[in-house]
């Protein structure tokens, strides 16, 4: 069907969203995630044997297998044990300075790491409430649980926190007491003066009540191994949504240590594409291109079913080799997270969707026949016999061990037998070959593919391209042709002004275009075109484009527009992208003194510094327009939580979240230096804030009586 036919009812502009994934809002997943999770779990079992045999693969405890069992034509999960040991030793011998840096990190920085760093995560599975929660709340709850059971405070260091987790896991039974909000109905009779009773009145009172739960040792281990699964939201250019996993706070500390150690090593390896920033990645690619050889080639592509074919045991084995000269406690510490992931249980969600004669219903997994019934022997049931999770010994989930998996790929790719340079970042890679002949180069490419298969990583034949001579390739969505490296084509259409703050919207757009020109992602002609497109979008978002209510309103004043967001012609060109609009207009004598004063006046509602009003992931919250009629607040929204949440028992957690927000913003106001780096103060947070406030009052220009009154008020 022709998309532009009049029957579709779509304008050419609207069809743009159907053709190009980077315009319009990003897709959001909804509905039951069970199918996606089960597909994730089933794949590693399907790929384990050359001839698919899922029932037999379910009994596999470890992913190690012989070279004859590795499929060379299709994805293969599992790894060859001897190869992983040999390749790990080779990498260790090749980069001794990287392992010296790791030793220094383990001896010094590991001991100083604080468990508070775990609060930086996003959504985390709460093992106590079986639901996702913001990381700080989940961490606070876990600390409370540990202290209640051990009867002692937990030290600030990460190691003391992990020791407490291990102690709790060894206890035969643990308990946790927490508060929930309840709605109590009260009945009252209204009494009249003559003693008669009136109608019955009912009202609700909100009260908090305490609940105690008991967890056995087996249940706690199960909770430690359980991963919360979620849809991966806002993914552009994909037909099917994917799932990601999040471990609970019991496992997160162990994962953090292993990933931080992997980061230390990767920072020292020339073939690593992580954890460096964008500019450094571009520099790495440019430097690798300066190759002089008879035949050069460049292989760029992806690894196929990367997470499903990875095996936790392969990464555990690699780390054990890296740490063979270390004390036993270090080896055990690094083994624990991989053992947890070896026994992982995926939370499978609400159930599978079935459709018959137009009726759609969701049934829990196992109730009705499905293509995933082979996995039923691995199902985990709750006390009522309902399937809540599925055990998965092979494979991994997205979002887990990104840095360790990169390290595993590098031990196979960074071998002395393979010529040229390799850059790897999770499942994305680029390899520059230097060879004497084309035959030699093809042999090298096959050697690279087979080396990666030995550790359980599969190059995707359909997504890989080998270009000779070297000079054209793609890595991390950045395309390059010789020394030109850029990805601005995919970025530009999503650069849409928000329509909330005229000043920052304009600055943001100009910065992106300026940065693209500075880093040679665009030349001046493309930059000028991008600037014109952005200017049009900017004026459109402030209703200053064409004939709108706002343009009619401004016209009625019989006053020429002053700024771009009022409909004035743009003053920016490719050479003035770095300058602020108001300054530039004043310098060009397009703004008079009076107009400048009016714009820059701090009490002017347009430029007044207001608190940040928008705090959002808009998908989960409803916009509510604030009742504020000042000119500067025309575009102000706040996102409120759905009313149903505030009436649920979880209201206590929302109150806790609010308290955390208040206390952190209060501490930041007391200690502005916190925005730059960590500050250490003697005493508790309360004492430190009190001392700082007293100092501010004493140093101020206030009258003595007012100072005394303020200090007395603080003491009371």
Swiss-Prot record:
Coiled coil: none annotated. InterPro entries: RNA-dir_pol_NSvirus, RNA_pol_PB1_influenza. It is an enzyme of class 2 (transferase). It catalyses: RNA(n) + a ribonucleoside 5'-triphosphate = RNA(n+1) + diphosphate. Residues 286-465 form the RdRp catalytic domain. Its EC number is 2.7.7.48. The keyword Nucleotide-binding applies. Keywords: Nucleotide-binding, Nucleotidyltransferase, RNA-directed RNA polymerase, Transferase, Viral RNA replication. One of its GO terms (biological process) is viral RNA genome replication. It holds the Pfam family Flu_PB1. GO terms for molecular function: nucleotide binding; RNA binding; RNA-directed RNA polymerase activity. Belongs to the influenza viruses polymerase PB1 family. RNA polymerase is composed of three subunits: PA, PB1 and PB2. This is RNA-directed RNA polymerase catalytic subunit. It comes from Dhori virus (strain Indian/1313/61) (Dho).
């Amino acid at each position: 069907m022709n998309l532009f036919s009049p029957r579709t009812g779509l304008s050419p502009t609207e069809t743009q969203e159907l053709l190009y994934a980077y315009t319009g809002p990003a897709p959001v997943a909804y509905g039951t995630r069970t199918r996606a999770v089960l597909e994730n779990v089933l794949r590693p079992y399907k790929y384990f044997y050359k001839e698919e045999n899922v029932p037999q693969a379910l009994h596999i405890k470890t992913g190690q297998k012989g070279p004859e069992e590795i499929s060379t034509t299709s994805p293969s999960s599992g790894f060859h044990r001897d190869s992983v040991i040999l390749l790990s030793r080779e990498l260790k011998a090749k980069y001794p300075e990287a392992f010296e840096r790791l030793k220094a990190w383990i001896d010094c920085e590991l001991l100083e790491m604080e468990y508070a760093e775990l609060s930086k995560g996003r959504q985390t599975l709460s093992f106590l409430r079986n639901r996702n929660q913001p990381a700080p709340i989940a961490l606070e709850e876990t600390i409370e649980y540990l202290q209640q059971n051990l009867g002692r405070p937990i030290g600030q260091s990460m190691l003391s926190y992990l020791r407490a987790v291990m102690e709790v896991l060894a206890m035969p039974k643990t308990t946790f007491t927490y508060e929930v909000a309840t709605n109590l109905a009260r009945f009252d009779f209204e009494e009249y003066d003559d003693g008669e009773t009136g109608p019955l009145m009912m009202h609700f009172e909100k009260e908090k009540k305490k609940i105690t739960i008991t967890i056995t040792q087996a249940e706690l281990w199960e909770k430690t191994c359980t991963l919360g699964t979620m849809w991966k939201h806002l993914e552009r250019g994909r037909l099917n949504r994917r799932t990601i996993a999040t471990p609970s706070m019991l496992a997160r500390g162990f994962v953090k240590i292993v990933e931080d150690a992997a980061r230390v090593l990767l920072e020292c390896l020339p073939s690593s594409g992580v954890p460096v920033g964008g500019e450094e990645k571009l520099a790495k690619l440019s430097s690798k291109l300066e190759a002089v050889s008879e035949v050069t080639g460049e292989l760029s592509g992806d690894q196929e079913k990367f997470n499903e074919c990875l095996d936790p045991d392969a990464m555990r084995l690699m780390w054990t080799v890296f740490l063979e000269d270390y004390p036993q406690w270090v080896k055990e510490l690094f083994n624990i997270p991989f053992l947890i992931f070896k026994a992982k249980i995926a939370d499978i969600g609400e159930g599978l969707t079935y459709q018959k004669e137009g009726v759609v219903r969701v049934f829990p997994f196992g109730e009705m026949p499905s293509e995933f019934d082979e996995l039923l022997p691995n199902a985990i049931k709750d006390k009522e016999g309902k399937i809540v999770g599925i055990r998965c010994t092979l494979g991994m989930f997205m979002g887990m061990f990104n840095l360790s998996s990169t390290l595993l790929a590098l031990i196979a790719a960074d071998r002395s037998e393979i010529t040229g340079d390799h850059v790897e970042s999770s499942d994305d890679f680029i390899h520059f070959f230097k060879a004497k002949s084309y035959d030699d180069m093809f042999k090298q490419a096959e050697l690279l593919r087979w080396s990666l298969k030995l550790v359980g990583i599969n190059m995707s034949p359909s997504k890989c391209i080998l270009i000779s001579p070297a000079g054209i390739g793609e890595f991390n969505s950045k395309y390059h042709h010789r020394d030109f490296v850029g990805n601005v084509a995919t970025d530009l259409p999503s650069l849409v002004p928000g329509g909330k703050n005229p000043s920052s919207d304009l600055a943001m757009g100009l910065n992106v275009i300026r940065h693209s020109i500075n880093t040679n992602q665009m030349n001046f002609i493309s930059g000028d075109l991008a600037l014109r497109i952005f200017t049009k979008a900017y004026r459109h978002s402030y209703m200053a484009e064409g004939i709108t209510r706002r343009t009619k309103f401004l016209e009625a004043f019989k006053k020429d527009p002053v700024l771009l967001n009022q409909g004035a012609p743009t003053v920016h060109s490719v050479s003035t992208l770095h300058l602020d609009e108001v300054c530039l207009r004043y310098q060009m004598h397009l703004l008079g003194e009076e107009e400048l004063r009016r714009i820059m006046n701090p009490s002017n509602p347009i430029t007044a510094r207001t608190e940040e009003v928008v705090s959002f992931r808009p998908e989960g919250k409803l916009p509510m327009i604030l009742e504020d009629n000042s000119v500067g607040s025309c575009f102000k929204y706040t996102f409120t939580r759905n009313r149903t949440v505030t009436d649920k028992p979880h209201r206590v957690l929302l109150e806790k979240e609010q308290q955390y927000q208040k206390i952190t913003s209060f501490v930041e106001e007391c200690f502005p230096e916190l925005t730059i780096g960590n500050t250490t103060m003697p005493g508790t947070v309360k004492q430190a804030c009190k001392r700082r406030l007293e100092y501010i009052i004493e140093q101020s220009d206030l009258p003595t009586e007012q100072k005394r009154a303020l200090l007395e008020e603080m003491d009371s």
